[in-house]
């Protein structure tokens, strides 16, 4: 199931997201895909700055916990797509853009490009590193 434009399957939180137009079965519905990408970028920035999640394993482990996902397979897939070890820290904006491509595919089989994510990153000035 994919809630409207929620290409990362972002769950409803305490505060509504920018561009949130509703909810569906515990997931956010976004006005546009761009809003979903923006929300994912904000989450990634929060993971890095507040929770010190720097590696694919740490990020995916928090985003897609084992009680809801095959987290180990998810981590392997993302690491393969980035050609990184699951334990290597992400250091560049490009790394996060590529991770977003892999995560959107894992979550909803949505095909994004790193440029799709980078354009939203620039537009809203959401730089993670």
Over which residues does each language-model region extend?
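Cell-wall polysaccharide-cleaving catalytic domain and substrate-binding groove, primarily
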Residues: 1-129
């Amino acid at each position: 199931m994919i809630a409207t434009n929620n290409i990362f399957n972002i769950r409803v939180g305490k505060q509504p997201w920018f561009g949130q137009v509703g909810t569906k079965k515990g997931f956010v519905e976004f006005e546009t895909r761009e809003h979903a990408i923006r929300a994912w970028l904000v989450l990634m920035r929060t993971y890095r700055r507040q929770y010190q999640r720097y590696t694919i394993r740490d990020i995916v482990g928090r985003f897609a916990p084992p009680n809801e996902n095959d987290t180990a397979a998810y981590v392997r897939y993302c690491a393969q797509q980035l050609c990184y070890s699951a334990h290597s820290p992400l250091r560049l904006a490009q790394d996060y853009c590529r991770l977003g491509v892999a995560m959107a595919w894992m979550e909803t089989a949505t095909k994004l490009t790193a440029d799709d994510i980078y354009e939203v990153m620039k537009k809203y000035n959401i730089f993670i590193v």
